[in-house]
Structure formats: structure tokens, C-alpha cells
Amino acid sequence: MITKEEAQKIAKLARLKFEEDTIEKFFTQLSTIMDMIDILNEIDCKDIEPLTSVCNMNARMREDAVTSSDLSSELFDNVSGNSAQLAKEVKYFITPKVVE
């Protein structure tokens, strides 16, 4: 159980501001949370192995395969307009100026 002064200090450290009518509600809720944490701390967990996942299934991995990832020729085949040939040569999309 925490005191009202401790609750006010925690609120100040967390930069929380409460009106006088809501500080009591904050104190009550914080006390309840701290009581729940105390209950959890009483549980003996020394014989329980930590979980890395909630289901014990192993992930099926695929074999790594080296593939060509150069899609630039396919991308630049879709370029149209006056600058299409230049875009294919320099491998940049040429767009109209949008910022002055």
C-alpha cells in the first residue's frame, strides 16, 4: 500500500497534474495496481521455464536462394513521354518540378 504523498510524488515525476477531486481517484487506482503487483511478486516462478513464444511450434524456414533482383529494365519499360529514353539510360525517373 502506498501513501497519498507517494502517489502525489509519482504523479509529479510523471508530470501529471490532477484537480483536487481527481487526485483521490488516481490514488485509489494506483494503490490497486501496486497491490496487484505485490500479489504477482508473491508467486513462486523459480521452477518455471521462461517462454519465448506462447506456442511451441518451430518456424519452417525456406532455403536461401540467390535470385536476380535488378528490376530496373522492367520498371523503366513503363516510362512514357519525352524523357523515357533518358530515364532508361540514367535509371532515374524524371518528373516535373514540384517545389519552387
From Swiss-Prot:
GO biological process assignments: glutaminyl-tRNAGln biosynthesis via transamidation; regulation of translational fidelity; translation
Record key words, sorted: ATP-binding, Ligase, Nucleotide-binding, Protein biosynthesis
Catalytic activity: L-glutamyl-tRNA(Gln) + L-glutamine + ATP + H2O = L-glutaminyl-tRNA(Gln) + L-glutamate + ADP + phosphate + H(+); L-aspartyl-tRNA(Asn) + L-glutamine + ATP + H2O = L-asparaginyl-tRNA(Asn) + L-glutamate + ADP + phosphate + 2 H(+)
Origin: domain of life: Bacteria
Family label: Belongs to the GatC family.
Assembly, per entry: Heterotrimer of A, B and C subunits.
Name used for this protein in its record: Aspartyl/glutamyl-tRNA(Asn/Gln) amidotransferase subunit C
Gene3D superfamilies hit by this protein: Glu-tRNAGln amidotransferase C subunit, N-terminal domain
Known role: Allows the formation of correctly charged Asn-tRNA(Asn) or Gln-tRNA(Gln) through the transamidation of misacylated Asp-tRNA(Asn) or Glu-tRNA(Gln) in organisms which lack either or both of asparaginyl-tRNA or glutaminyl-tRNA synthetases. The reaction takes place in the presence of glutamine and ATP through an activated phospho-Asp-tRNA(Asn) or phospho-Glu-tRNA(Gln).
GO terms assigned for molecular function: asparaginyl-tRNA synthase (glutamine-hydrolyzing) activity; ATP binding; glutaminyl-tRNA synthase (glutamine-hydrolyzing) activity
InterPro entries named among the record's database cross-references: Asp/Glu-ADT_sf_sub_c, GatC
EC number: 6.3.5.-
